[in-house]
């Protein structure tokens, strides 16, 4: 599977009361990867929601990624995204197998991405590129970093942080393979608008 296009990331607070409706609306518009991001300690609910999302993703031929929880990912047969504080990538690869998608947060540091690539990452994520409500304190990344990463890395590059339809095009033009979007996708007034935004993000890769 080619990892290129929209990478939708859920936010339990933003999607309160409309979680599945908006997620399915995004999938309708086209999502390459869907990340389930929930930082709560309610393990039973997280398992239930992850299994529901997995079934939705299978229907739309999308791959599900679990944020920061390799054990949950292994339990349901999903991929995982690991932050820099979540430990080395190698144990997750051993747990999930060779075919699983494993992503790694690399902030704005190319050496972190090069290390993740050596450890078997499926993709690396840089950001934040713009002001972000999800990660307000994250170090800023630049288009120059993206150019350097594109020249030295031979795996998909994901970009994250305040990405909207108004600012995403330069990121794609500088080599981003995956646009990771939270509020720029799900902060819409209606499910129909979520679908429209998803289609518009994907169109940036074909222009």
From Swiss-Prot:
Its cofactor is Mg(2+). Pathway: Cofactor biosynthesis; thiamine diphosphate biosynthesis; thiamine phosphate from 4-amino-2-methyl-5-diphosphomethylpyrimidine and 4-methyl-5-(2-phosphoethyl)-thiazole: step 1/1. Binds 1 Mg(2+) ion per subunit. Keywords: Magnesium, Metal-binding, Thiamine biosynthesis, Transferase. One of its GO terms (biological process) is thiamine biosynthetic process. The keyword Protein biosynthesis does not apply. It catalyses: 2-[(2R,5Z)-2-carboxy-4-methylthiazol-5(2H)-ylidene]ethyl phosphate + 4-amino-2-methyl-5-(diphosphooxymethyl)pyrimidine + 2 H(+) = thiamine phosphate + CO2 + diphosphate; 2-(2-carboxy-4-methylthiazol-5-yl)ethyl phosphate + 4-amino-2-methyl-5-(diphosphooxymethyl)pyrimidine + 2 H(+) = thiamine phosphate + CO2 + diphosphate; 4-methyl-5-(2-phosphooxyethyl)-thiazole + 4-amino-2-methyl-5-(diphosphooxymethyl)pyrimidine + H(+) = thiamine phosphate + diphosphate. It is an enzyme of class 2 (transferase). One of its GO terms (cellular component) is cytoplasm. 4-amino-2-methyl-5-(diphosphooxymethyl)pyrimidine binds at residues 35-39, 67, 105, 135. Gene3D superfamilies: Aldolase class I. The keyword Magnesium applies. This is Thiamine-phosphate synthase. It comes from Pseudomonas fluorescens (strain ATCC BAA-477 / NRRL B-23932 / Pf-5). The gene is thiE.
């Amino acid at each position: 599977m080619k990892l290129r296009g929209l990478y939708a990331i859920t936010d339990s607070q933003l999607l309160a009361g409309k979680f599945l409706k908006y997620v399915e609306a995004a999938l309708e518009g086209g999502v390459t990867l869907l990340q389930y991001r929930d930082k709560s300690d309610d393990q039973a609910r997280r398992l239930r929601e992850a299994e529901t999302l997995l079934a939705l993703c299978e229907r739309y031929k999308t791959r599900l990624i679990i944020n920061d929880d390799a054990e949950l990912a292994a339990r349901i047969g999903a991929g995982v995204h690991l932050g820099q504080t979540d430990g080395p990538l190698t144990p997750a690869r051993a747990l999930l197998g060779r075919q699983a998608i494993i992503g790694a947060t690399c902030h704005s540091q190319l050496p972190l991405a090069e290390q993740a690539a050596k450890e078997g990452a499926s993709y690396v994520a840089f950001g934040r590129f713009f002001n972000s409500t999800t990660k307000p304190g994250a170090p800023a990344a630049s288009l120059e970093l993206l150019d350097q990463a594109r020249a030295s890395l031979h795996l998909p590059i994901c970009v994250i942080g305040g990405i909207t339809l108004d600012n995403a095009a330069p990121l794609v033009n500088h080599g981003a393979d995956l646009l990771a979007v939270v509020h720029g996708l799900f902060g819409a007034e209606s499910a129909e608008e979520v679908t429209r935004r998803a289609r518009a993000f994907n169109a940036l890769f074909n222009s």
